[in-house]
């Protein structure tokens, strides 16, 4: 994620017109979410609370959004790391206030960003049962044990709106297929453990 430009920092200076720290805190919280940026209500609140034009409010919210996203994306968790993002000539008290507010909320924002990222469908439930499948042909009658595996899969919420789509998939596995699958899952587990321990 690209660093902030001089224009972004100039837009952030509009926060000096805020009547209280709570106004700055509220704008930081509201501007983190991408969906909130286009809301007319947020623009109107920003215009009235800071006495700025619509254009200045948009630039400020974009700058705040970019700053908070950058901190969450880079996983900056110390005041020093966040302060280093600001230019030297940036208003000292505003810089300190923004850093304090960001530190208060960065872990929540990271969790929100991770939950909202576009991803592959997720496995939400897994169930199985063992059945005896009988088959008959002219040669002999056979009873073959099989595993019926039912997986419930949730589509990415950002792609399907407010109501996440959950679908069920049922597969039938022979003992040989199940053995191969378990062997492959064991290797995946070993690789994940190796990566996690690095």
From Swiss-Prot:
Q: What is the lineage of its organism?
A: Eukaryota, Metazoa, Chordata, Craniata, Vertebrata
Primary location class: nucleus
Q: Which residues belong to any copy of the COMM domain?
A: 122-196
N-acetylalanine sites (modified residues): 2
Regarding tissue, the record states: Ubiquitous.
Q: Does the keyword Acetylation apply?
A: yes
Family designation: Belongs to the COMM domain-containing protein 9 family.
What is one GO cellular-component annotation here? extracellular region
Q: Which UniProt keywords apply?
A: Acetylation, Cytoplasmic vesicle, Ion transport, Nucleus, Sodium, Sodium transport, Transcription, Transcription regulation, Transport, Ubl conjugation pathway
**Subcellular location as annotated:** Nucleus; Cytoplasmic vesicle
Q: Which InterPro entries match?
A: COMM, COMMD9, COMMD9_N
According to UniProt, the name of this protein is COMM domain-containing protein 9
Q: List the disulfide bonds.
A: none
Query: Which Pfam families does the entry link to?
Result: COMM_domain, COMMD9_HN
Report which superkingdom the organism of origin falls in. Answer: Eukaryota
GO BP terms, alphabetized? cholesterol homeostasis; sodium ion transport
Job of this protein: Scaffold protein in the commander complex that is essential for endosomal recycling of transmembrane cargos; the commander complex is composed of the CCC subcomplex and the retriever subcomplex. May modulate activity of cullin-RING E3 ubiquitin ligase (CRL) complexes. May down-regulate activation of NF-kappa-B. Modulates Na(+) transport in epithelial cells by regulation of apical cell surface expression of amiloride-sensitive sodium channel (ENaC) subunits.
């Amino acid at each position: 994620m690209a660093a902030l430009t001089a224009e972004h920092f100039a837009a952030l200076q509009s926060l000096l017109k805020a009547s209280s720290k709570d106004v700055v805190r509220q704008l930081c919280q509201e501007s983190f979410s991408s969906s909130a940026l286009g809301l007319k209500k947020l623009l109107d609140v920003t215009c009235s609370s800071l006495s700025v034009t619509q254009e200045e409010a948009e630039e400020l919210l974009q700058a705040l959004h970019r700053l908070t996203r950058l901190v969450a994306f880079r996983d900056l968790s110390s005041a020093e790391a966040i302060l280093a993002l600001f230019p030297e000539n940036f208003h000292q008290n505003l810089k300190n206030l923004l850093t304090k507010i960001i530190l208060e909320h960065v872990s929540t924002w990271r969790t929100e960003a991770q939950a909202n990222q576009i991803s592959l469908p997720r496995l939400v439930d897994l169930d199985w049962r063992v059945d005896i499948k009988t088959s008959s042909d002219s040669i002999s009658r056979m009873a073959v044990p099989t595993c019926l595996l039912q997986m419930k899969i949730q589509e990415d919420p950002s792609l399907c709106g407010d109501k996440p789509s959950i679908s069920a998939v049922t597969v039938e596995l022979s003992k040989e297929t199940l053995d191969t699958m378990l062997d492959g899952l064991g290797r995946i587990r070993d690789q994940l453990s190796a990566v996690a321990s690095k």
